[in-house]
Regions:
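Repetitive beta-architecture junctions, highlighting loop-to-beta-strand starts
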Residues: 19-21, 33, 64-65, 93, ...
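Blade-level signature of beta-propeller repeat domains, shared across WD40, Kelch, NHL, RCC1
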Residues: 94-134
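Conserved blade-register residue in beta-propeller folds
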Residues: 23-25, 68-69, 118
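Short Gly/Pro-enriched loop/turn and capping motifs at secondary-structure junctions
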Residues: 43-44, 55, 62-65, 73-75, ...
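Blade-edge beta-strand/turn elements of extracellular beta-propeller
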Residues: 25-41, 71-90
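Glycine- and Gly-Pro-enriched alpha-helical subdomains that act as flexible
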Residues: 4-34
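Conserved beta-strand positions in repeat-built beta-propeller and related beta-rich domains
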Residues: 7, 12-19, 56-62, 70, ...
Length: 134
């Protein structure tokens, strides 16, 4: 299950084992308000991240291998479908987590069952800050 914050830190998104994303208000003292149902359905349930516009990227977990992109208002904007493996034996497609990176933050790295996929986006994601001791 995944946790992501909105770019302004006012919302926390939590994916649940029953394929829901709940949205909580983050209070000024750091506590959480009551949740509202943000979105639910197939393609939700594992890792999630946000971009600079506040869109939420959620991975499907154990299949089908997709990343759903949902607006801050809860509207499905689109999906990223991972490749389907043909031949025998058939392998399950999954998308378990994702991270934004690259020099401009517009590369989305997606962890699959046995591969890592990358896709270039038009919008930057929230890239985690790194604390490097020199």
């Amino acid at each position: 299950n995944g946790i992501a914050l909105s770019p302004d830190g006012k919302w926390m998104y939590l994916s649940t084992a029953n394929r829901q994303i709940r949205r909580y208000a983050v209070n000024s003292d750091g506590t959480l308000g009551a949740f509202t149902m943000f979105t639910e359905g197939v393609g939700i349930g594992d890792g999630q991240k946000t971009d600079v516009a506040g869109n939420v990227y959620s991975t499907s977990g154990a299949g089908p291998g997709i990343v759903r992109i949902t607006s801050p208002e809860g509207k499905l904007l689109g999906t990223i479908n991972l490749p389907i493996y043909g031949g025998e034996p058939k392998r399950q497609i999954c998308a378990t987590n994702e991270a934004f990176g690259g020099t401009d933050g517009k590369t989305l790295f997606i962890a699959g069952c046995d591969s890592v996929y990358t896709i270039q986006l038009k919008i930057a994601g929230i890239v985690p800050a790194h604390n490097v001791n020199k």
